[in-house]
């Protein structure tokens, strides 16, 4: 369903139930209400996290991955049942209510798992308390303890993230206590390196070679030695730091700037898989001991900000009137003085309000427990079980689609720009399903595509798939793919 870009059960009504059902080996596809009921039954078992961890172990083992890309994604909430904390949504440049998901991907953008924050957790907090313990416990490491003991510079694995989790003390803890390396952007860069320090390197990013001007120096932050790599482009120097001592200069740059594959993953999933859609709208309570910023404190701070804006405007008006009074003739002085008196009175009133609001804010706690919040503003959260279930299915679809696209790219000239659009075209094209019981085959005959080069690429991929001898689930029929040309 998701591979066909059918984004919710209701959209099944616009597809032939008989023909769509045959793809799954059924007489007809389930009706929308029936499918929702099935999803609800599966979600009620609360096994989605175990399923995700099982898949993450399998994927990480097959990838032999040692680089994990971490980033947050905000699922904006526009409903009224839940009271969610506001998060900054970078793609909209606004603070909006929503749920924050922290995703773990590889450098190709392929997802492993994600963890949902409860209220307004930051990336650094989630790394320390949730993501790293999960990686250490659930996901197999590429290197054994013996290999780590024999090579003191070898990291267990490397985390790649943006400036949000920047903390030299945290980097020191990761390397000294856990042997985990990091690659991230450096904050507060206050010097410029000489242009003669930079040399041109060829860096491979997403299969395309990019020329970069790079330089490297060692630096020390919080008693931990780091490698600092800078990229020079258009008079701007982008600083990257890492505790990984094994990587070459261009490899560090490649891994840092390949972080955009994760951003592209979020964008692609939103557009093609309706990533942020909810199948259920149930609300759950949050642990009452969780400490959050007091909403009343925020409200007072907002009032204080508005009062100070009015004070600044009155001061600017008063200054202009005083200047005009000096520059004008004596006949205009009474008029200017009258205006100055009015504005001075308003200014004094606002200053008194500022002192009153400041006093009120001092008496208000900056952070409180959720249990101490008034009932009408107390935070809760959306049920994440059904959302996780559908996200796991979408992860599987994305990985399957990407694997198929990579197979196509070996036989297709415009693979970088068009391979995903070709995969979508194949998935949505018509095909004949022909059981051949005499030879124990299930023949899938794809209809011809728009151009001969597309057909040629598909034919070569069909041969690769046929060599795997995959059997249709629940039968002894071997899948045989061919294209009608």
What is each of the regions a protein language model found here?
Residues 1-51, 105-111:
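Short, positively charged, Gly/Tyr-enriched micro-motifs
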Residues 12, 31, 35, 64-75, ...:
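Short, conserved catalytic/metal-binding motifs centered on acidic residues
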Residues 32-107:
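Active-site-proximal, Lys/Arg-enriched surface segment
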Residues 90-147, 237-238:
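Electropositive, glycine- and tryptophan-enriched low-complexity nucleic-acid-binding patches
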Residues 150-152, 171-181:
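Short, surface-exposed basic-aromatic patches at helix termini and helix-loop junctions that form
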Residues 159-169, 188-191:
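Acidic, metal-coordinating catalytic cores used for nucleic-acid/nucleotide bond scission
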Residues 176-262, 270, 431, 439-443, ...:
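An anionic, glycine-rich sequence signature occurring as long contiguous blocks
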Residues 208-211, 288, 295-485:
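A short, flexible helix-boundary coil/loop motif
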């Amino acid at each position: 369903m998701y591979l066909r870009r059918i984004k919710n059960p209701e959209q099944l009504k616009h597809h032939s139930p008989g023909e769509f059902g045959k793809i799954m080996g059924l007489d007809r596809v389930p009706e929308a209400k029936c499918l929702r009921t099935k999803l609800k039954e599966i979600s009620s078992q609360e096994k989605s996290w175990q399923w995700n961890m099982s898949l993450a172990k399998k994927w990480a083992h097959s990838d032999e991955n040692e680089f994990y890309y971490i980033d947050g994604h905000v699922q904006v909430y526009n409903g009224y049942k839940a009271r969610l904390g506001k998060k900054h949504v970078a793609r909209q440049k606004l603070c909006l209510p929503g749920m924050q998901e922290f995703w773990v991907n590889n450098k190709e953008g392929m997802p492993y798992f994600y963890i949902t924050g409860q209220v307004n957790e930051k990336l650094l907090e989630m790394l320390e308390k949730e993501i790293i313990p999960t990686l250490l416990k659930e996901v197999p490491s590429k290197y054994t303890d013996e290999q780590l003991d024999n090579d003191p510079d070898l990291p267990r694995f490397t985390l790649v993230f943006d400036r949000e989790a920047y903390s030299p003390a945290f980097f020191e803890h990761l390397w000294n206590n856990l042997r985990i390396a990091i690659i991230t952007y450096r904050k507060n860069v206050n010097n410029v390196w000489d242009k003669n320090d930079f040399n041109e390197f060829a860096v491979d990013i997403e299969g395309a070679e990019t020329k970069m001007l790079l330089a490297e120096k060692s630096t020390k932050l919080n008693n931990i030695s780091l490698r600092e790599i800078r990229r020079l482009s258009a008079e701007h120097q982008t600083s990257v730091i890492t505790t990984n001592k094994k990587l070459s200069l261009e490899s560090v740059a490649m891994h840092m700037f390949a972080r955009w594959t994760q951003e592209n993953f979020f964008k692609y999933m939103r557009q093609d898989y309706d990533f942020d859609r909810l199948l259920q709208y149930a609300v759950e309570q949050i642990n009452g001991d969780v400490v959050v910023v007091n909403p009343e404190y925020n409200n007072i701070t907002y009032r204080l900000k508005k009062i100070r804006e009015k004070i600044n405007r009155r001061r600017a008006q008063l200054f202009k009137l005083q200047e005009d009074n000096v520059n004008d003739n004596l006949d205009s002085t009474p008029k200017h003085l009258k205006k100055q008196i009015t504005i001075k009175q308003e200014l004094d009133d606002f200053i008194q309000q500022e002192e009153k609001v400041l006093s009120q804010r001092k008496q208000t706690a900056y952070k409180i427990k959720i249990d101490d919040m008034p009932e009408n503003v107390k935070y809760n959260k959306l049920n994440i079980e059904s959302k996780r279930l559908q996200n796991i299915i979408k992860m599987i679809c994305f990985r399957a689609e990407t694997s198929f696209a990579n197979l196509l790219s070996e036989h297709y000239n415009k693979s970088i720009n068009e391979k995903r659009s070709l995969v979508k075209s194949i998935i949505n094209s018509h095909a004949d399903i022909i059981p051949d019981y005499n030879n124990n085959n299930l023949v899938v005959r794809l209809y011809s595509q728009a151009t001969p080069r597309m057909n040629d690429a598909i034919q070569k991929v069909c041969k690769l798939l046929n060599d795997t001898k995959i059997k249709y689930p629940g039968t002894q029929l071997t899948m045989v793919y061919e294209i009608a040309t």
